Amino acid sequence: DPGSAPKVVRSRGGSVSGAMHACLIMVVMVVAAYLRFVGLNWDELQHLHPDERFLTMVETGIYPVEGGWTEYFDTANSTLNPHNQGYSFFVYGTAPVFAVRYLAQWISDSGFQPIDIGIQSSLVLGSRYDQVQLVGRLVSAFADTLSVLVLYFIGRRLYNRRVGLVAAALAAVCVALIQQSHFFTVDSFSNLFVTLGVLFAARALYSDNTVNYACFGLALGVAMASRINTAPLVLLIVVVEMSRPVVGGWRLSGGLRMALAAGIAITV
């Protein structure tokens, strides 16, 4: 039938190409992970990075709430609020700080260490002053490694697999990203959710699925909870909606989808 869609015939060469592509992505991710996780104790517990040192002090000053969500949202009395622990000049986002603090507490309570899963390492993780910064660096390294993978999917969504692979490969060996991933700061953590926001915006460009908008709002919310200067990312979803042709009741439905994204971001 000349009017029917053409059939896609996959050859053996195409499957080999796909397998090779998958192998290349794995190589890129292994390289990215190695460059980010190697040498995490680069200062030998001397706390040489000023921002990291301040965050470490805050982490040892706050501690997880025991009264559930009620105590968590009780700003005046919450044990997680740095302002209640003498750090009234705290200006960083709380999402990475809380994530690291809870993870460090879990490690301390469980006694878990890297050697328990066969990783030969001299790192001692926990919630103490000389331990929590290493937990924070692990979180930064993990977040930045994931950012490389997300960048691949962005390139693949907007262009093709090759562009995604090149973008991921360049990010994997980017000196600035590797450097930041070795610090317990909010940068690598927030960057992960910024890239996730870009990914879901790119997906929304080709599909008006509400899930993409909800995930964009979630990513935007966590990004802003890490660094408030990531707020302009919200303009991206507006550009996506404005790029669509007006069809029927599109403006109303598009507005509702953006309102959903904004509502989730504000809630987070």
PLM segments and residue spans:
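Transmembrane-helix motifs of polytopic, lipid-linked glycan transferases
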Residues: 138-158, 196, 200
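Short acidic/glycine- and proline-prone juxtamembrane loop motifs at membrane-interface regions
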Residues: 176, 182-190
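Interfacial juxtamembrane loops and adjacent helix segments
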Residues: 47-48, 52-141
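Membrane-interface transmembrane helices that cradle and orient dolichyl/undecaprenyl
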Residues: 162, 197-215, 223, 242-248
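Hydrophobic alpha-helical membrane-interfacial segments at the cytosolic entry of transmembrane helices
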Residues: 24-29, 214-215, 219, 234-237, ...
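Transmembrane signal-anchor helices characteristic of membrane glycosylation enzymes that use polyprenol
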Residues: 21-48, 52, 65-83, 169-173, ...
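Short helix- or helix-capping micro-motifs
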Residues: 32, 167-172, 179, 199, ...
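Hydrophobic core segments of transmembrane alpha-helices in multi-pass, intramembrane catalytic enzymes
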Residues: 55, 144-147, 190-198, 215, ...
